[in-house]
């Protein structure tokens, strides 16, 4: 189909409750709509050619009897940025859980307020402090993930459940016999770290901007809902535009074809 599978901020749909942010509170009951799986497995996939992921996506959506539960894409540059600039967030969530995040944000807010009384401290001092402290913590990412990042530009986390695990394993083994790239099946620890790394990657953009605010200019983010049948999903910018970009981070959801693309423009 040449229509998107998912829309973000589609103004045509922002009516009623959806168009009343800050005005209407909605309470709902969450119920299970699918049977709870007995087991799950995360597949970590890498390639240097986006066309390989295009073909894998098509094969899975068209031919698989069991569809994935999750499929998150991350470009190598985004992986690197998240590893460096979201490391402290990763560690806090891994050790203390997401429930601690409101407390952490409150601590950061108070530190930033106090730091304004000291002219020699940089703006958003809490970000500078947490970034500095994170350097003393050892590498938090599994070796196999690191090896894939070194070998491949494009990374894809796919979670399968129950019968879909064997179906995906057989498919990937066969596919990568004849195509560039590779995959591995994550251990439980690798699965948690892969998903958490992808989760905190969104924060790397803001952290980088806070630390480098003297060297960069404008920043902007785009959520792009691609048509279901779009094959050229990975953006390649013209040289004249690429040369003006200081940082760009690409990540997204390949199965529903939504890409999150963040850019920071060079000063001047």
Where is each model-derived feature located?
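Noncatalytic alpha-helical scaffold of FAD-dependent oxidoreductases
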Residues: 1-268
